[in-house]
């Protein structure tokens, strides 16, 4: 009797240990996916790098901070095809060991717009490229992988596939955009950048008191994400002070560009969580 239940238990344990070993050896699973079910000549569509991180691991945003390397895709497309840059979702705070950086955990799509030529002929098209990344957790793992996806060419549009449509929609919603409900002024002061965030509409004014936490993700390396932030507030504005990075571009940019993020959201409905800013830097 004991042997009857012990054998499957041992098999289950072996399977579990194998999966743990695989997760340790391969902390990132990456594939090329699309919600498109066909390609129409001359009509742009989206593919995406689908990232699945093992628990405790992360990859990096387009501007990682003072450590890390952003995920990239080098395409090998036929003549007449065009691949745009990655449309980056808003990042989150991650850690390379004890160093704060900007990146992604868990599951994420990195969308890329593809434009086929107008004279595309019927048949099947295979799109190929080589992905590169740095995945870090308790260790760091640089990686490269050849990826491809094949779709039929159709003269008429076909419905998007069910498998990826929801996740594409969620990731597009997570791409930070400008928000006219707020004005941001940036000044340089003794090795720091001071952002003054003021409501510009009545709904933003009503929501100001609800905002408790704000994080800035630098888009160009001007700010050091690993240095402490100072957040203060008055009845009319939020003031965020950050340290200029010793690795900042020289001469310093005349704009402060990046993502402002708050878990309370920037408007009364709790959305958006992230907004894109690009504002002049004044002395």
Residues covered by each model-derived region:
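Bacterial N-terminal signal peptides
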Residues: 4-19
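Extracellular/lumen-exposed scaffold segments
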Residues: 21-283
């Amino acid at each position: 009797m004991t042997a009857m239940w012990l054998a499957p238990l041992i098999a289950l344990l072996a399977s579990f240990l194998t999966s743990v070993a695989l997760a340790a050896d391969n902390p990132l699973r990456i594939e090329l996916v699309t919600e498109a079910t066909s390609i129409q000549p001359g009509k742009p569509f989206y593919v995406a790098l689908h990232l699945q991180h093992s628990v405790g691991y992360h990859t990096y945003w387009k501007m990682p901070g003072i450590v890390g390397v952003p995920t990239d895709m080098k395409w090998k497309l036929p003549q007449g095809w065009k691949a745009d840059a990655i449309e980056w979702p808003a990042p989150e705070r991650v850690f390379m060991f004890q160093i704060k950086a900007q990146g992604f955990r868990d599951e994420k799509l990195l969308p890329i717009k593809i434009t086929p030529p107008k004279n595309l002929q019927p048949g099947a098209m295979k799109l190929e490229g080589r992905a590169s990344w740095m995945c870090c957790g308790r260790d760091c793992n640089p990686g490269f992988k050849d990826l491809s996806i094949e779709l039929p060419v159709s003269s008429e549009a076909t419905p998007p596939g069910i498998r990826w449509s929801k996740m594409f929609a969620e990731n597009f919603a997570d791409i930070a955009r400008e928000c006219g409900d707020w004005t941001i002024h940036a000044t340089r002061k003794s090795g720091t950048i001071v952002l003054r965030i003021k409501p510009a509409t009545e709904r933003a004014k009503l929501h100001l008191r609800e905002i408790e936490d704000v994080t800035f993700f630098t888009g160009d390396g001007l700010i050091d994400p690993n240095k402490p932030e100072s957040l203060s507030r008055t009845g009319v504005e939020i003031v965020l002070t950050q340290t200029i990075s010793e690795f900042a571009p020289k001469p310093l940019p005349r704009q402060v560009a990046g993502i402002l993020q708050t878990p309370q959201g920037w408007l009364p409905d709790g959305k958006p969580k992230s907004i894109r800013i690009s504002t002049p830097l004044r002395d």
